[in-house]
Amino acid sequence: MSDQVKIPRATLKRLPLYYRFVSSLKSKGIDRVNSKAISDALQIDSATIRRDFSYFGELGKKGYGYNIDSLLDFFKSELSESDMVKIAIVGVGNLGKALLTYNFSIHDDMTITEAFDVKEDVIGQKIGNVIVKDNDELITTLKKEEIDVVILTTPERVAQKVADELVQAGVKGILNFTPGRINTPSDVQVHQIDLGIELQSLLFFMKNYSE
């Protein structure tokens, strides 16, 4: 990604959506696509799609559209999916167990390799292909395995404490499923997943924009 262009955060958050859709076209043997087809499938305005893509140079040609293979190569490079991304999860309650069981089965290049909890009845369990470790091993293991990305599913009351430990371990990205906001240094990216807000947003759009 060019260091000369400031890419809007909203654009970056749409890249995985584009990638998943283009991957589905590839699996169907389709070799090119235009912005209207992407718009119809993802319900994103065509102008927004063209603007998003324009930040990354000439990805397509007017009158032709976008080559599927070229788009896939681009998205893989931007989303770091050309290399295996190892992920850890902290907090193996109901949500944590569900995520471990799912373990990004549709993504060949992302996998949860480590899981941590404080509960004695959970530590040592094998969930999916991952054995749950004691939180006491958190910092040491993350450093040793060079894990940069962590999914946080702990109780809210300990979320900040765990986040501080993640920063100490060198983690650069946290997907926070806890209700509370966590504070981290500016070089650590935090994405807050609030299911209540997402559902409220969904209901709003259903009420106001459904045909």
UniProtKB/Swiss-Prot annotation:
GO terms for molecular function: DNA binding; DNA-binding transcription factor activity. It is found in: Cytoplasm. Its main location: cytoplasm. It comes from Staphylococcus aureus (strain bovine RF122 / ET3-1). GO terms for biological process: negative regulation of DNA-templated transcription; response to redox state. Modulates transcription in response to changes in cellular NADH/NAD(+) redox state. Belongs to the transcriptional regulatory Rex family. PANTHER family: REDOX-SENSING TRANSCRIPTIONAL REPRESSOR REX (PTHR35786), REDOX-SENSING TRANSCRIPTIONAL REPRESSOR REX 1 (PTHR35786:SF1). Keywords: Cytoplasm, DNA-binding, NAD, Repressor, Transcription, Transcription regulation. It comes from the Bacteria. Homodimer. NAD(+) binds at G91, V92, G93, N94, L95, G96. SMART domains: CoA_binding (SM00881). GO terms for cellular component: cytoplasm. It holds the Pfam family CoA_binding. HAMAP family: Rex. The keyword Transcription applies. InterPro entries: CoA-bd (IPR003781), NAD(P)-bd_dom_sf (IPR036291), Rex_DNA-bd_C_dom (IPR009718), Tscrpt_rep_Rex (IPR022876), WH-like_DNA-bd_sf (IPR036388), WH_DNA-bd_sf (IPR036390). Residues 17-56 bind DNA. This is Redox-sensing transcriptional repressor Rex.
